């Protein structure tokens, strides 16, 4: 069970995200930037994923299955080193912003609401694409 974070402990959004991730993942704040792989369930309307990417700078594998993320723009542009991305059942409607994942090699986006693949053409390194259960 997660501990509550006291308001006095939080200085800004970056600090709040660090504390939340540290508690949720069970690691020290100083070790967050070293994590190569994580699995989270988030609602991009409530959680600032741009800041999360700035904190998790070494991240190469990101699993966000069963999250609420309707488009890649909601994730931001800070996950530059992610090579493998899992986003099954996330209510994704469009792929605009996918090019922010500059190193993306594997994309698992099954059972979403995707009906257009145009933006996938910007993913130069992509070798694996799972679209099962989409409208394409």
Which residues make up each language-model segment?
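Phosphate-binding glycine-rich loops and adjacent basic patches that engage nucleotide phosphates
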Residues: 12, 102-107, 133-136
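Low-complexity, polar/charged sequence tracts that form flexible coils or short amphipathic helices
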Residues: 52-54, 75-78, 97-100, 110, ...
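The feature captures the LRR N-terminal capping module
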Residues: 1-88, 93, 106
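Leucine-rich repeat domain C-terminal region
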Residues: 93, 111, 115-119, 124-136
